[in-house]
Amino acid sequence: MWNKFINLLSALFTALNVGVALWFYLTTDEIAIPAHWEALESAWGYGRSWLILPLSALSVLIYLLLRYSRRHTLVNLPFAVTNKVAAHPLIVSMMSRATFLITLALFYVVLAVAQLVPLHNGLLFVLFFLLLSEVVWHVIRIYRVRK
């Protein structure tokens, strides 16, 4: 149940990502948008406003690959898993949470490029740390039920 809710939120953030990108592109004139940020959170590179569309398309592609691609989940683990029945729900949970955190980060970047929110590198680092923590936590749980 919880995984379905997280997957629904991931799809919602991806749809909002596309909506914000289309809204920004269709309602603004040809302006320079921030395309590169330095570590001090100030933009130092700018691009055309249409660059938000490939960024949003890349977000959709990443979401679709994470969510719907066929993957051999047990092959990518650093240890052998014999209890596949117990490990599979943990792997599904890990992938749904990772997809959620990645789509949330990409939505935040599109909002920052559309200049609706300021880009804070610290927030992206927190999301990245949460992503790594979720993966490590799930791999430890999978390791415990592997036999």
What are these regions (language model features)?
Residues 42-60, 91-96:
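Interfacial helix-start motif at the membrane-water boundary
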Residues 71-94:
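Cytoplasmic juxtamembrane regions at transmembrane-helix boundaries
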Residues 1-14:
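Alpha-helical transmembrane segments and their helix-start/interface "positive-inside/aromatic belt" motifs
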Residues 105-147:
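Alpha-helical transmembrane segments of multi-pass integral membrane proteins
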